[in-house]
Amino acid sequence: MAFFDNTRKPTGLGGRIMVSMMNIGHRSLADWGLKYLKLNNDANVLDCGCGGGANIKKLLKLCPNGFVKGIDYSPVSVAKANKVNRGAVSIHCCVVLQGNVADMIFASEWFDAVTAFETVYFWPNLLQSFKEIYRVLKSGGTFLICNESNGDTDKDEKWTKIIGGMTIYKDAELKTYL
């Protein structure tokens, strides 16, 4: 496996390094995106493709009386996210699970908000994943997709040649799927 393939599904030592790097490297983008997410103190939030758990930690601060769940299909990511959020996990206001966004175990209409930071690029069945998110999201809830790349530059497309299974969607494409 090439090192950058660990952005899609982190495994082994390279994956552990990658999730730590993503926790740092995506910080500015996440801070920017979270400014647009309005949450009540007691909100229930799901972070899809939660990676190393840095955004779960931020979400917990935004809804201190709520509950934050994370899901990722990489065991390496789940382990790191649990470690980063061990305090919240230990007091039962957070849980991080291994799973597939296209087929989630969560109850219907349970989440006030669902987030996806730098992850929809790697979802093989985007339409099914969005249907599942719609199912678990409460009526009137918010789905925040926060991507650095939107396919508007050649720089964006270079990553699809480096990382297998990566698709960069233009804004209009994502809106069509939604």
Give, region by region, the residue ranges found by the protein language model:
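C-terminal alpha-helical "lid/dimerization" subdomain adjacent to the S-adenosyl-L-methionine
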Residues: 4, 10-23, 142-178
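Short glycine-dipeptide loop
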Residues: 42, 137-142
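Class I SAM-dependent methyltransferase SAM/SAH-binding core
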Residues: 44-103
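A short SAM/SAH-binding and catalytic strip from SAM-dependent methyltransferases
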Residues: 112-126
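A short glycine-rich, Lys/Arg-flanked "PGG" loop and its adjoining helix->strand segment in the class I
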Residues: 127-139
